[in-house]
């Protein structure tokens, strides 16, 4: 499905996307491959910012389920996203792409604080900006952080790279008869509790008219194909079914 007129996008990656074949942590070859995808998209003339989850290192909700204090566990998850952001920054800069990391939890020895106008200037100058540490507060997912940054940066679309090629009516890994949707409305996603992003993230995108594009980031070259309208994806937006 074509995505015309895009100038600025936010790409949301799960932390698990950086694991590659490993069961945990960061696989340098996989990060380098993801960075090449981002560079290819940037070379199309797009302004790009990223949000990366932290589930490959630590997931706050999983920690809370095992008895940890939820807020404490979420802060640990936020720190994991900073580690992933620094890994991606390194990979992008090795490809010659100037990159800045901005963290919602200030740590000025390793990255900038989140400053909206500074982030906008970075992108206008052709730099990639990676937003880390979610929204800087517990009880919010990195999906919510991605929706917030997409709204702040006035992005034309939020692209969510996952391990599947769109949104289905059932888990395609468990149900061979699962059907993929080409387009969905925000309200349909919320009403049917479809697993696109958490409800607060979808609502924030709806209120700011930011389309959500769900696609498979693990397929080489797929980000560029989706941006060209040639790849397989699901678009969540206004006026869809």
From Swiss-Prot:
<dbReference type="GO" id="GO:0044210">
    <property type="term" value="P:'de novo' CTP biosynthetic process"/>
</dbReference>
<dbReference type="GO" id="GO:0005524">
    <property type="term" value="F:ATP binding"/>
</dbReference>
<dbReference type="InterPro" id="IPR036393">
    <property type="entry name" value="AceGlu_kinase-like_sf"/>
</dbReference>
<dbReference type="Pfam" id="PF00696">
    <property type="entry name" value="AA_kinase"/>
</dbReference>
<feature type="binding site">
    <location>
        <begin position="135"/>
        <end position="142"/>
    </location>
    <ligand>
        <name>UMP</name>
    </ligand>
</feature>
<dbReference type="InterPro" id="IPR011817">
    <property type="entry name" value="Uridylate_kinase"/>
</dbReference>
<dbReference type="GO" id="GO:0033862">
    <property type="term" value="F:UMP kinase activity"/>
</dbReference>
<feature type="binding site">
    <location>
        <position position="171"/>
    </location>
    <ligand>
        <name>ATP</name>
    </ligand>
</feature>
<keyword id="KW-0067">ATP-binding</keyword>
<feature type="binding site">
    <location>
        <begin position="12"/>
        <end position="15"/>
    </location>
    <ligand>
        <name>ATP</name>
    </ligand>
</feature>
<dbReference type="InterPro" id="IPR015963">
    <property type="entry name" value="Uridylate_kinase_bac"/>
</dbReference>
<dbReference type="InterPro" id="IPR001048">
    <property type="entry name" value="Asp/Glu/Uridylate_kinase"/>
</dbReference>
<comment type="similarity">
    <text>Belongs to the UMP kinase family.</text>
</comment>
<feature type="binding site">
    <location>
        <position position="74"/>
    </location>
    <ligand>
        <name>UMP</name>
    </ligand>
</feature>
<keyword id="KW-0547">Nucleotide-binding</keyword>
<feature type="binding site">
    <location>
        <position position="59"/>
    </location>
    <ligand>
        <name>ATP</name>
    </ligand>
</feature>
<protein>
    <recommendedName>
        <fullName>Uridylate kinase</fullName>
        <ecNumber>2.7.4.22</ecNumber>
    </recommendedName>
</protein>
<feature type="binding site">
    <location>
        <position position="54"/>
    </location>
    <ligand>
        <name>UMP</name>
    </ligand>
</feature>
<dbReference type="GO" id="GO:0006225">
    <property type="term" value="P:UDP biosynthetic process"/>
</dbReference>
<comment type="pathway">
    <text>Pyrimidine metabolism; CTP biosynthesis via de novo pathway; UDP from UMP (UMPK route): step 1/1.</text>
</comment>
<comment type="function">
    <text>Catalyzes the reversible phosphorylation of UMP to UDP.</text>
</comment>
<feature type="binding site">
    <location>
        <position position="162"/>
    </location>
    <ligand>
        <name>ATP</name>
    </ligand>
</feature>
<keyword id="KW-0665">Pyrimidine biosynthesis</keyword>
<keyword id="KW-0963">Cytoplasm</keyword>
<dbReference type="GO" id="GO:0005737">
    <property type="term" value="C:cytoplasm"/>
</dbReference>
<keyword id="KW-0808">Transferase</keyword>
<feature type="binding site">
    <location>
        <position position="168"/>
    </location>
    <ligand>
        <name>ATP</name>
    </ligand>
</feature>
<keyword id="KW-0418">Kinase</keyword>
<comment type="subunit">
    <text>Homohexamer.</text>
</comment>
<feature type="binding site">
    <location>
        <position position="55"/>
    </location>
    <ligand>
        <name>ATP</name>
    </ligand>
</feature>
């Amino acid at each position: 499905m074509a995505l015309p007129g895009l100038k600025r996008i936010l790409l949301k990656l799960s932390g698990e996307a950086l694991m590659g074949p490993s069961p945990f942590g960061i696989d340098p070859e996989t990060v380098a491959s993801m960075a090449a995808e981002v560079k290819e998209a940037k070379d199309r003339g797009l302004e790009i910012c990223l949000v990366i989850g932290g589930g490959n290192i630590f997931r706050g909700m999983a920690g809370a389920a095992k008895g940890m204090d939820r807020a404490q566990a979420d802060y640990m998850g936020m720190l994991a996203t900073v580690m992933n952001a620094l890994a991606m920054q390194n990979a992008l800069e090795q490809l010659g792409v100037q990159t800045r990391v901005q963290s919602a939890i200030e740590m000025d020895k390793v990255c900038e604080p989140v400053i909206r106008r500074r982030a906008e200037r970075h992108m206008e100058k052709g730099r990639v900006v990676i937003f880390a540490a979610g929204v800087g507060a517990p009880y919010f997912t990195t999906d919510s952080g991605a929706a917030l940054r997409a709204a702040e940066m006035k992005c034309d679309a939020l692209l969510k790279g996952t391990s599947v090629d769109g949104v289905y009516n059932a888990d395609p890994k468990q149900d061979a008869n699962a059907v993929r949707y080409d387009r969905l409305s925000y309200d349909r996603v919320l009403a049917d509790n479809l697993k696109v992003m958490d409800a607060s993230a979808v609502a924030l995108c709806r209120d700011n008219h930011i389309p959500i594009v769900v696609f498979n980031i693990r397929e080489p070259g797929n980000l560029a194909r989706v941006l060209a309208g040639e790849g397989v994806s699901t678009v969540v937006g206004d006026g869809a079914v």
